[in-house]
Amino acid sequence: MRAFLIGRWQPFHKGHLEIIKKISKEVDEIIIGIGSCQKSHTLTDPFTAGERMMMITKTLENYDINYYAIPINDIDYNAVWVSCVESLTPPFTTIYTGNSLVRELFSEKNYNVKKPELYNRTDYSGTKIRKKMLDGSNWEHLVPEEVVKVIEEIDGINRIRRLSEKDYDEE
């Protein structure tokens, strides 16, 4: 069986890894959708699709997991988004998502939809990790070592800090 899992992976963290490891025990192959692939260089989406793909592939090299990592664009037409995903991916029967809109769209197309159990969401949150990066707090323990290396290679911390700078003085 092949399943689809979509996320923004901004950045790919240990919670994501645990979800993928768990799903890999339930299916033969996982299609990892790199969602909102067109977005980058913002505080909520600082990393490009290619950088996120590097984070995922370099991390999963260490695991016996059969997967495809595929960039998926957002489109402003929800009713046809599932068809767009289907055209970009190998066939699959099950989708794992925590997003209520994605659940609804795939349910309407008669897919088997499962909500993955989040792994320690208190610590493993992309929003919190990006905030730690911005604040200069310790974040490295929250992501796989390979992700730390990718972020260092692309100078990701300084990118996030530059993106947070204001072009004007706040009064």
Curated annotation (Swiss-Prot):
Any one GO cellular component localisation term in the record: cytoplasm
EC code: 2.7.7.1
Entry's localization field: Cytoplasm
Pathway membership: Cofactor biosynthesis; NAD(+) biosynthesis; NAD(+) from nicotinamide D-ribonucleotide: step 1/1
Molecular-function GO terms, alphabetical: ATP binding; nicotinamide-nucleotide adenylyltransferase activity
Cytoplasm in keyword set: yes
Matches recorded under HAMAP family: NMN_adenylyltr
Homology family: Belongs to the archaeal NMN adenylyltransferase family.
Protein name: Nicotinamide-nucleotide adenylyltransferase
